[in-house]
Amino acid sequence: CGPSGAGHFVKMVHNGVEYGMMAAYAEGLNVLAHAGVGLSDRDLDAETTPLRVPEHYRYELDIPRIAEVWRRGSVVASWLLDLTAAALQEDPSLQGFSGQVSDSGEGRWTVLSAVEEGVPTPVLSAALYGRFASRGRDDFANRLLSAMRQQFGGHHEKKEPK
């Protein structure tokens, strides 16, 4: 597909695309996993996102089953979705995982190459930054954002019920 050595570059971009696809599956299934938010009462204040129509969010969905349906003939079907469905069958609540997502370097290299080439890659960049955020390295920044909100508007942190 190109001169000698180009294969490594092509594989690197392949892995960057993979980061984006994985993030899209994870985000979409996360929306479905939280589709029951309207089943319980929520405080309506400046610290929460009020549901305009709670009855639109009263679904208790079988996420492993949805992944299985999607992988069989859907436009989003792929080997990655096959693996996603298998993981959800094995551990539907994903309790065996911490949620810290490593990057092997290829996604990072893809984004750096895009910057050097002046080529926009918002999806691939967001997927890489999502992996960074999963490691808790944004905890200080998030605490600082909370502190600033309290300073300028007296906005105290809303504690999520456990």
PLM features: what roles do these ranges have?
Residues 1-12, 23-29, 33-162:
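NAD(P)-dependent Rossmann-like dehydrogenase/reductase catalytic/cofactor-binding core
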Residues 18-19:
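Glycine-rich phosphate/pyrophosphate-binding beta-alpha loops
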